[in-house]
Structures are given as C-alpha cells and as structure tokens.
Amino acid sequence: MLSLKLFLVTLFLSLQTLFIASQTLLPSNSSSTICKTTPDPKFCKSVFPQTSQGDVREYGRFSLRKSLTQSRKFTRTIDRYLKRNNALLSQSAVGALQDCRYLASLTTDYLITSFETVNITTSSKTLSFSKADEIQTLLSAALTNEQTCLDGINTAASSSWTIRNGVALPLINDTKLFSVSLALFTKGWVPKKKKQVASYSWAHPKNTHSHTKPFRHFRNGALPLKMTEHTRAVYESLSRRKLADDDNDVNTVLVSDIVTVNQNGTGNFTTITEAVNSAPNKTDGTAGYFVIYVTSGVYEENVVIAKNKRYLMMIGDGINRTVVTGNRNVVDGWTTFNSATFAVTSPNFVAVNMTFRNTAGPEKHQAVAMRSSADLSIFYSCSFEAYQDTLYTHSLRQFYRECDIYGTVDFIFGNAAVVFQDCNLYPRQPMQNQFNAITAQGRTDPNQNTGISIHNCTIKPADDLVSSNYTVKTYLGRPWKEYSRTVFMQSYIDEVVEPVGWREWNGDFALSTLYYAEYNNTGSGSSTTDRVVWPGYHVINSTDANNFTVENFLLGDGWMVQSGVPYISGLLS
C-alpha cells in the first residue's frame, strides 16, 4: 500500500513539474507540436495535460509511466475475468484470456525496464545504440503483446459481449498509448546513425564478414563446448560424442553445467520439460550456458520455457533424430498462440540439431510447431514442420541458421526482428482451394524495429508439392498487419513462386504502408519483371539491403558470437 501511495504521489508531482520548460539541450514544445511525430496525434494530445510544455524526453517519460500504470491495471482486469467468469466461458475464450494474462506480465516487465532506462537518462545524455535498440525492441514487443491479446480476444471470444467491452476496448486504448510511448522514445532517444556495438567480454573476436569456426563441425564432429572435467566425462559417456580438445577460449563455447535427456532412463531426465525445470533461474551468462543434451527419440510433449530460464542451450542428435512433437490446433479449441509444440520466452536461448513438429495436419488450420518470444534467441541446424502457421517468430530479436522450415499458409509469421540465413524454406501441399504464403509479417506500428529478413536462403517446393505438379499457387508473403515488413535478399527462389511474388491480405489493406523488398536473388522464380506494383513494394540496392543484415538489423555482432553458431555479418560479397 505504501509503495502504491508513493507511486501516486510521484505521478501527481509529475503532472505539476514534468512539463515546466527545462533548461536543457533539447527544445521545449507544446504537446500539439510533439504529438505531430506520432502515428495518432489526436490521441497523443489526450495523453498529456492541455497546458503541458517540455522536451520530447519529458513527454516520453510521462507517456512511459502512464503506459506502465495501464499495463498493471489491465493485468488486474484479466485476473478478475478469469476468476469470475471461467465456468461461463468457452475453452477458446478462457485460453485467449490466459494468453492475455501471460502477455500482460511480459509487457509490464518490458515497460519497467524501459522506464527505468529513460528515467535515469537526462536530456543531455545519450544512450548507446545497443541500449537504444534494446529499449526500442522491448517497446515494440509490448505493442506486439497487446496486438496478440487483441487478436485472440477477437477470434476466440467474439461472441462474448462482456469480454469485448471489458477487455478489448481498454486494450485498444492501451495499444494507442504504447504507440505514443514508442514514437516518443524513437524520436527522443534512438540515435540517428548506427554506431559500433560492443561485444560481450567473453565473445569471439569480431569478423566483419563471417563467423564460422566454433560450430562448423557441430553436426558430426567434436563439439566445441568448454566445461569442467567431471561434466565433460559425464557428457561424453552419455552422448558418445567427444568434445573438441581445444584450450583456446576463442574457439569454445562456455558451459556452466549440462544435463541429459534420454527416454530409456540412462540420462538425468526422461522428458525435456523436467530438464528445463532443473535449469537455474535468472542467470547472467557470465558462467556460460546451461546445456540440455536431448538424445535421439520422439518426445511427445508440449514444452514451455519461461522467461527466467536464461542462457539455456538445447542440443539434439540431429534433424529428424531428436524430435519434439505435438498436435495442438485452433480447431480443437486452442489459441494460435498456445498451440505451439515448443514455446520459448527465455532470453539468449539456443537450440541446435533439433526437429520441432506439429502433426495436427492442414485440416486443423493454425497449428504452431515453434513459438519464440525469446530475445537474442538462436536456432541452428533445426527443422520446423507443420502446415498453417508453422513457425511463430512472435517478438524480440531472433536468428535462424541452416534450418529447414516446412509449411503452407503463412508458415513463417509474427512480429520479431528476425534474420533467416542459409535456411531452406519448403512450401508444401495445402488443402484444396488453399494457397501457400511463405511469410505473414505482423508489424503494426511504423516505429517498431521489427521485420523478416530472408538472407542467402533457398525457397523450393517440398516433395508433396512437387508431386502435385504445382497446382497450388505459392507466394513470398502477404501483409498480416498494416506495416508488414519482409525482405528477400541474395536467396535462391525456385519457379514454385508465382511471378507476381506477393499476395494481398484483403483488398488494398496495407498495400501502401507495408515494406516488401527484394535484392539480388537468383533462380527461376526470382525475376522481378512481373512483380506486384504496390506502393510498398521495392526492388532495392545494396545500401538498403544492408539495413536488413545480421550486423545492422539485429546488431548481431554484439551478442551472437558467444553462442558459437556460424553467421554472416553483412551481405555476401
């Protein structure tokens, strides 16, 4: 109670003092002037007192503080609905509310981190680009969480008047408020030019072209993991694989501990979930990764890795050898968000040599194999297999290298900042009267630093689509949300892709606000001569394409090298 009173007093004082013209390096303006830089100036002005006066950072702090208050209020609203109306609601409606509760918790955490950062940053102090990118990423994810909740409510609880009015309407206003906070942060704190990003102290030396040595022989050779002698002996006896004999820290990945999963009982655990639960909470990574080695086998379980299981690395025996499988889907009452066979939210998660599968089939519609809301997550030498909505790159920053993704409708979707590199994208045979869309990117706000980058990948049909003689139309993507952003660059595009390349979502929705681009692709389906002529479609040059590389889009040189996973930092020369 005392903390609540203190917060309210602070909020009241901020109304009195926040907008007094400050003698800083930033100009003081009215809310009308400041709000012109936001997507919804009218709503933006309603956020602030009418006589307010201040610089963009003062407005930004106030908006973030108010966003945090509203996020906490919304969480309490969801709790009330789940407590009072559970027995009266359908399974899908309860599932949508539970998704909202989970997402609201994440959003509150993101807003706390964002507000604490800007609150200690004076008008004369600048944020490093990596820190500014982190906060812009968190605020982008907060908006994504709101939209995910709203989509779920509109789909699963559309017939419930009380939920529509008690949950959806406040959620819409909160989304507008978060958009204001993101816009003002982008205006006030994000540097105009990107600067060199510092690497972790225990990462490998930076190579501006590629990082390939540590895991290059991961699939079949010795593993470059650095651990204690006891842990090494246990691992090698259980896995029957040797670790690299290399005392040079530059060429090894630091490991704090390791456990094994084996269905025959010879490991530490028989299920992946048990192994995940054994991992330490809230580690900072300085001691290395907690490794879970999953031996070959088919694991029929829905795995959820919570946000507190940081720096977790999961290693399998290879694609189609270590398989995690499930069959949740929307037809059977699950939400799209919660249909995932494998779902991860923990930062700095790494998966290697694994297959993630949803076996629901095309007739069950949305059925997710993998959902990642994990910041700074990496998937290397993995496969993702389903039909509609296979891979849900939900939010935050993600990287996929040498992975195979199979699906039909919107089979790579979400609103993360994500780069796919050296991956194989396999459109497969959908249901009758359906078409294939490889991507459905979900950016809802022009200030979100999100999008899908397909770099040096191969797009070709799966075997079942080949046997159908290409009777199904396949597209590079379609705009799920208003500011959808997807780039294909330096990739091989097979003739399976329609000459127009892209498909509408619904009429002219988003055709002027989306950003779809292609750069220097090859293959019989790569010609841009007959591509769509939408205002938002572009054939770009190398300067523009550089914005969507690992180095610039993910700032990957600052965090990816510690994982040992190979990657190309920039464009191919």
Curated annotation (Swiss-Prot):
It comes from the Eukaryota. It is an enzyme of class 3 (hydrolase). InterPro entries: Invertase/methylesterase_inhib, Pectin_lyas_fold, Pectin_lyase_fold/virulence, Pectinesterase_Asp_AS, Pectinesterase_cat, Pectinesterase_inhib_dom. The keyword Phosphoprotein does not apply. Residues 1-22 form the signal peptide. It catalyses: [(1->4)-alpha-D-galacturonosyl methyl ester](n) + n H2O = [(1->4)-alpha-D-galacturonosyl](n) + n methanol + n H(+). The record marks 388 as: Transition state stabilizer. Transmembrane segments: none annotated. Its main location: secreted. Keywords: Aspartyl esterase, Cell wall, Cell wall biogenesis/degradation, Disulfide bond, Glycoprotein, Hydrolase, Secreted, Signal. Pathway: Glycan metabolism; pectin degradation; 2-dehydro-3-deoxy-D-gluconate from pectin: step 1/5. GO terms for cellular component: extracellular region. Substrate binds at residues 336, 366, 478, 480. PROSITE patterns: PECTINESTERASE_2 (PS00503). Its EC number is 3.1.1.11. Disulfide bonds join 403-423. The active site is at residues 389, 410. Residues 259-557 are annotated as: Pectinesterase 41. Residues 25-184 are annotated as: Pectinesterase inhibitor 41. PANTHER family: PECTINESTERASE. The PMEI region may act as an autoinhibitory domain and prevent untimely PME activity during transport. In the N-terminal section; belongs to the PMEI family. In the C-terminal section; belongs to the pectinesterase family. This is Probable pectinesterase/pectinesterase inhibitor 41. It comes from Arabidopsis thaliana (Mouse-ear cress). The gene is PME41.
